[in-house]
Structures are given as C-alpha cells and as structure tokens.
A protein has these predicted regions:
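Sec-dependent signal peptide recognition
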Residues: 1-8
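General secretory precursor processing signal
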Residues: 3, 60, 110-112, 136, ...
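Bacterial Sec-dependent signal peptides at the C-terminal "C-region" and cleavage site
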Residues: 8-26
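N-terminal helix-cap/turn-to-beta initiation motif at the start of protein domains
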Residues: 27-44
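Short, solvent-exposed coil/turn segments at beta-strand boundaries
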Residues: 39-40, 60-69, 87-88, 122-129, ...
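Contiguous, well-ordered beta-strand patches that form the walls/edges
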Residues: 48-55, 70-128, 134-136
Length: 150
C-alpha cells in the first residue's frame, strides 16, 4: 500500500480515517551507544628513579569501557573493576577493586597480594595528565599518570 501525505490529508478532509497499520510490519534499527569515562585508556605512572643502577620500572593502568581495569607494576600483574563517578562536590572519585593479583614484586620493591583491596582516589585531570588525590579538593595529590593510549 503506497500512502502519500496528500492522500492522507485529502482523506481526513473528507471525513475519512487513517489506514490501519497494525497489519504492517515495521523494522526498527537498534543503536547502542557507550559513554566512556575521561579516564578510559592506558595510563603510565611517573616514577622517580631512586637508584641510577636499577633498570627503569613501569607502572601502567588500563581502564576499559566495561569498568574493567588491568594494572602492571614491575613483575606484578593485577586486574579488577573500577567505578569513576562525579561526587557533586569537588573532583570525581575513582574506586578500584582488585580481583586478582599475581603477588609478584612491584616497582617499589614490595610484594603484597592486593586481591580484594579497594583503592579510592579523587581524580584531577588536565589534558593527557591525571593525578590521584587523597582529598576531593585536589590539594593532596601523590600520584601523577600520563596517558599512553586513548
């Protein structure tokens, strides 16, 4: 059935009704969208080298769009879930829960199993740099990370 706008208006003007489309099948396209948090991607912690004789050590965090994170520090490998949310007062908060830790030595020389641990930080982000702060005002920021990959 081919229906035009003029045909519908003419039919209505003469006291007619609209055709019953209940028998007509319609296909509706479904579109999925994902909103990525600002921190999605891979970040590297800036580490100060305390001993020139020691090889350089890298600590990296990868935040996925599915609220999964993967971390590595020296020989240590971890993964888990994260939540990044606006607090309404001050900086956004980042909560990371470690679900697995291989309990290997990290860049600071420590060997601690962090499985089950939850880290909470407030995030101050400027361009390709992110700082993890202890307070929502961003006055006590101990860790600075640089974006490696989007």
């Amino acid at each position: 059935m081919n229906i035009s706008l003029i045909g519908i208006l003419t039919s209505l003007a003469m006291g007619g009704t609209l055709p019953d489309d209940s028998k007509t099948q319609q296909q509706v396209a479904q579109v999925s969208t994902h909103i990525l948090p600002n921190i999605a991607g891979q970040w590297q912690l800036r580490l100060d080298k305390t001993d020139a004789a020691q090889p350089s050590c890298q600590e990296r965090y990868n935040f996925g769009r599915d609220q999964q994170f993967i971390g590595s520090s020296g020989q240590e490998f971890t993964y888990g879930k994260y939540l990044y949310a606006d607090t309404g007062d001050g900086l956004p908060a980042l909560a990371i829960q470690t679900q697995y830790d291989n309990n290997a030595t990290d860049c600071s020389g420590n060997r601690v199993d962090q499985t089950g641990d939850i880290l909470v930080a407030y995030v101050k982000q400027q361009g390709e740099q992110m700082q993890w702060c202890k307070d929502s005002k961003g006055t006590r920021c101990d860790m600075t990370l640089q974006r490696v990959l989007p």
